[in-house]
Structures are given as structure tokens and as C-alpha cells.
Amino acid sequence: SFCGSGTVLIESALYALNIAPGLRRNFSAENWDQIDASVWRKEKERAQDLIRRDARFQGRGFDIDGAAVSLTIANAKKAGVIGCVQAEKRDIRDFKTETETGVVICNPPYGERLLDIKQAEELYQIMGQVFQPKHGWSYSIITPDEMFEQCYGRKADKRRKLYNGMIKCQLYMYFK
């Protein structure tokens, strides 16, 4: 919904495809004398073999900011998942559940990050209107705002405490 730089979208694709973290990177430890180069080569080959090339993942990200959409696309290309990730400029008000099943995970901008508190609360109200309960769909929203449920208009089915960097947040999950 708010793809930003695409972190959640890209990490979801990497997970769905079973692409090992750091697979496309080189590490200085690969040059250590204590570990034969063949060990690194074999492990990278094994990780490549474990990729689920037939996975049916299709991630879609939306953002009202065209620059964020461009950044998401660029980052998906760098991560090697552009084939299963789409990003487009779209207002949250235009969100529709167009498929039988789906998962929305978002970390919307909030007062401490990008918007003032009033703007963030207005955004939460809009989200509550467009993220309607639908069989086969779930919505997970990360925010530090303790008034989120009140603004969203529904109590979460489940909540989890987490930190987004140094910011104490809640993960509000809606799946019923």
C-alpha cells in the first residue's frame, strides 16, 4: 500500500522465492585462508538450487509518491525480484481487493517519520475504510500510534509489540 523504498515488498518476494539473504553479495570472509574457496562456491550453488523458481508470488506496492515508486522498482531490480514485484503510483483511496486472497503488510508514514500526527490519523481512517474484512485477505499495519485502532475504526484481531529501528511500534493484524 505504501511501498516507500520497497523494503517490505522486496523482502516478501525474497522470502516467497526462498532466496537466501546475501546470496547476491560477496563477503570479505570469502577471502580468508582458513576456509577453502570451494566451500563458499558449494554453499552458493546449494543456495541457488534452493530458490523456488516456480513460486507463484506476485507482490504489488502502491504509493502516492512517484519517486517512492521509482525507488521501489530500482531496488526490486537490484534484489533480482523485479519479475514478481510491481509498483505503481496510486492513492490509498483507490485500493481494491481484486483477487480471492491477499496479504497487505504496510508501514505507513506516521508523525515521527513523515507526517504530522493529524495527517497520520486521517490516513488511518482512510485505511480502515478501504481495508475491509474479506475472506482470504489479511491486513497487517506497523505503527507507533497507540490510537491507531480508534482511528482505523476496528480493534485488531491480534497485536504484537515490535521496534522499527529505535521506534517502539505495534503490529496490528486483521484477518477475521
Language-model features: where?
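C-terminal catalytic and target-recognition region of SAM-dependent MTase-like enzymes
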Residues: 91-176
